[in-house]
Curated annotation (Swiss-Prot):
PROSITE patterns: CYTOCHROME_P450 (PS00086)
Gene ablation phenotype (knockout): Cells lacking this gene show a slight reduction in the levels of cholest-4-en-3-one-26-oate, but the concentration of 26-hydroxycholest-4-en-3-one is not measurably affected. The levels of 26-hydroxycholest-4-en-3-one and cholest-4-on-3-one-26-oate are drastically reduced in cells lacking both cyp125A3 and cyp142A2.
Enzyme nomenclature, EC number: 1.14.15.28
Pfam families: p450
Organism domain of life: Bacteria
Gene Ontology annotations of biological process type: cholesterol catabolic process
Cofactor: heme
Family: Belongs to the cytochrome P450 family.
Organism this protein belongs to: Mycolicibacterium smegmatis (strain ATCC 700084 / mc(2)155) (Mycobacterium smegmatis)
Biological function: Involved in the utilization of cholesterol as the sole carbon and energy source by degrading the side chain. Primarily catalyzes the sequential oxidation of the terminal methyl of cholest-4-en-3-one into (25R)-26-hydroxycholest-4-en-3-one (alcohol), (25R)-26-oxocholest-4-en-3-one (aldehyde), to finally yield the carboxylic acid (25R)-3-oxocholest-4-en-26-oate. Also able to sequentially oxidize cholesterol itself, not only cholest-4-en-3-one.
Protein name as annotated: Steroid C26-monooxygenase
Pathway membership, UniProt: Steroid metabolism; cholesterol degradation
Amino acid sequence: MTQMLTRPDVDLVNGMFYADGGAREAYRWMRANEPVFRDRNGLAAATTYQAVLDAERNPELFSSTGGIRPDQPGMPYMIDMDDPQHLLRRKLVNAGFTRKRVMDKVDSIGRLCDTLIDAVCERGECDFVRDIAAPLPMAVIGDMLGVLPTERDMLLKWSDDLVCGLSSHVDEAAIQKLMDTFAAYTEFTKDVITKRRAEPTDDLFSVLVNSEVEGQRMSDDEIVFETLLILIGGDETTRHTLSGGTEQLLRHRDQWDALVADVDLLPGAIEEMLRWTSPVKNMCRTLTADTVFHGTELRAGEKIMLMFESANFDESVFGDPDNFRIDRNPNSHVAFGFGTHFCLGNQLARLELRLMTERVLRRLPDLRLADDAPVPLRPANFVSGPESMPVVFTPSAPVLA
């Protein structure tokens, strides 16, 4: 581990910062020397665990309504709302994410995991991202939303395009692609909403169409935005934690072997996978008043990035944070955020991670990286993780008829 001695000259909006392998060294300098850091363009960033929590505990000063991305305005979905509007919308959407609804998916998610492994198990090799990690959450979310299996690839592409649009510099081409994708998604979603109003089913679309809190229901446009948030949030984050976390298990063979021998160690491993990968790199809050925050002057109207990944490697909270340890306890990471905006889908994400990792450990116990080359990361400033991860294993027979 090298120690950065000079102030990092970085652009926190440039996706390459999160993908070139230097971010965590830069974070270390920021936490030690400038807990609320300004990058080369003047963008403020809360980098310590305490600074992130302090901002999240004070939404009156650190508002979500200006939008969670540094260079884009707020959108009409709950992640860009403050309470009480946020709380009302959250209650409406939460009807589709109750513990019972999530646990009712155990068998179907388990079958899906086996189906994905069955598709590659006889080959003895696959791309873990493309073949295992990426299809799982999209299929789960697609199933919950009630979309047809044939429509999942389309949803996956829309999700990728939208996240890339939210995670990159805004230029005319990016804006146009974002608008085209959103228009296609809106047309698709409104058609589904119309069908569910006429013939309700038990899927998430039907729940959102018919859920009511304090006498209020969501409009069609509100359902479009909230399902879009569910699609993006449920896809990318779980995908990157599964692939990036599995990479670390494979690079720490003693810990992989311990899990193969004792699956009861898995809950701790899942939490360390979440901390280590920190797939949501940051979110922004907008200052409602001038203040001095952890030694840095902030102005009303400016945005500050809450650096969740940096917080998850804060030495004052996590002992030996740069070592991956499945026995880490306590592990109070903020991979799902903190406070009123704590991730609504955290139970579903943990379930998917557990069910797939259980099966990979059992069915592909000698899984290993195809080579020692670094796993390439997606150059994105919002949600980032492995782009590709070739793996090899001893071929085996499918388990589903």
